Curated annotation (Swiss-Prot):
The modification N5-methylglutamine is found at residue 235. Methylated by PrmC. Methylation increases the termination efficiency of RF1. Belongs to the prokaryotic/mitochondrial release factor family. InterPro entries: PCRF, Pep_chain_release_fac_I, Pep_chain_release_fac_I_sf, Prokaryotic/Mito_RF, RF-1. The gene is prfA. This is Peptide chain release factor 1.
Length: 360
């Protein structure tokens, strides 16, 4: 392992011991904000420190075993100890480097999930509904909560657009690679000739930012319209103008929310979505600039980037970013998408490790 990495690990170890002492200090215990912040930092460092401790122990084991190689009676046992320790050391070093990768501070946040029907007419709307059901079932398996903020239903079923807030542990970290174009190839129910059609939807995943991190939005840049919330088929579901549509004039972004019966609550939710969209747009712009110099699995910021194809006749799903194909389409559409999500996260970490190893 590089001396620079060992030096960084030593510093983290010192900080861990410092935090341990601080958490036992009466003045910190009486200050809930400080205690909470230190506890969080302490728990984040715990795995790194314990893994580093194991790394040091394995190196010590190897050094001690090497001293026994000249002893004929102990040589065989020493060689076994060295081999076993070196094998484990390799795994521990790899794990340590992953733990040292820069953390995306947004990973632990809840996420807004937006699904929009694209090309393909009614079939695209039906597929948007299928995707929302897939993510909802995945959320259920993860014990996350899904709250629909806005929905525009398609005439043949599914959605022209749906926006939901997904709440739980590490939601954004798990779902952020889902942003992009999702394409479906199948025979629509309305197709009498049995021809395969291709339709598409775009998915956008954005972190729900805490108020302290939300950008300031100039009220003069907003146009706010109110209207009556509609249910399926267009019927009005209440008699007051509680639904809210906010247009951000400089960017043309439009956010609607009709989830609550209170206009005030709908406005607050719509503003929160708008704030996240504005931050995401800025991050996408940076991602597009980075994508010109290196591969970026988070995409170039273009929501039409085709990331995945769902082929029903062949029962397969292909992720085009890492050339991964699985032949368990039914399971995937029922929410079992970890086998698509985890390889992308692993590949992203490998890219980060490669960038880290290029540093002096």
């Amino acid at each position: 392992m590089k001396p620079s990495i060992i030096s960084k690990l030593d510093s983290l170890n010192e900080r861990y011991e410092e935090l341990e002492a601080l958490l036992g200090d009466a003045s910190v215990i009486s200050d809930q904000d400080k205690f909470r912040a230190y506890s969080k930092e302490y728990s984040q460092l715990e795995e790194v420190v314990k893994t580093f401790s194991r790394w040091k122990q394995l190196n010590s084991n190897i050094e001690e075993a090497e001293l026994l190689l000249d002893d004929p009676e102990m040589k065989e046992m020493a060689q076994m100890e060295i081999e076993e320790s070196k094998n484990e050391l390799e795994e521990v070093e790899q794990h340590l480097q992953i733990l040292l990768l820069p953390r995306d501070p947004n990973d632990e946040y809840n996420a807004y999930l937006e699904i929009r029907a694209g090309t393909g007419g009614d079939e695209a709307g039906i597929f948007a509904g299928d995707l929302f059901r897939m993510y909802s079932r995945y959320a259920e398996m993860k014990r996350w909560r899904v709250e629909v903020l806005s929905e525009n239903e398609s005439e043949q079923g599914g959605y022209k657009e749906i926006i939901a807030l997904v709440s739980g542990d590490n939601v954004y970290g798990q779902l952020k690679f889902e942003s992009g174009g999702h394409r479906v190839q199948r025979v629509p129910k309305t197709e009498s000739q049995g021809r395969i059609h291709t339709s598409a939807c775009t998915v956008a995943v954005m972190p729900e930012l805490p108020e302290s991190e939300m950008p300031e939005i100039n009220p003069a840049d907003l146009r706010i319209d109110t209207y009556r919330a509609s249910g399926a088929g267009g019927q009005h579901i209440n008699k007051t103008d509680s639904a809210v549509r906010i247009t951000h004039i400089p960017t043309g972004m439009v956010v609607e929310c009709q989830d609550e019966r209170s206009q005030h609550k709908n406005k607050a939710k719509a503003l929160a979505v708008l704030a996240s969209r504005l931050v995401q747009a800025e991050q996408d712009k940076l991602a597009a600039e980075q994508a010109t110099t290196r591969r970026n699995l988070l995409g170039s910021g273009d929501r039409s980037d085709k990331i995945r194809t769902y082929n029903y006749p062949q029962g397969r799903v292909t992720d085009h970013r890492i050339n991964l194909t699985v032949y368990r389409l039914d399971e995937v559409m029922n929410g079992k998408i970890d086998e698509l999500i985890q390889p992308i996260i692993t590949e992203y970490q490998a890219d980060q490790l490669a960038a880290l190893s290029d540093q002096p």
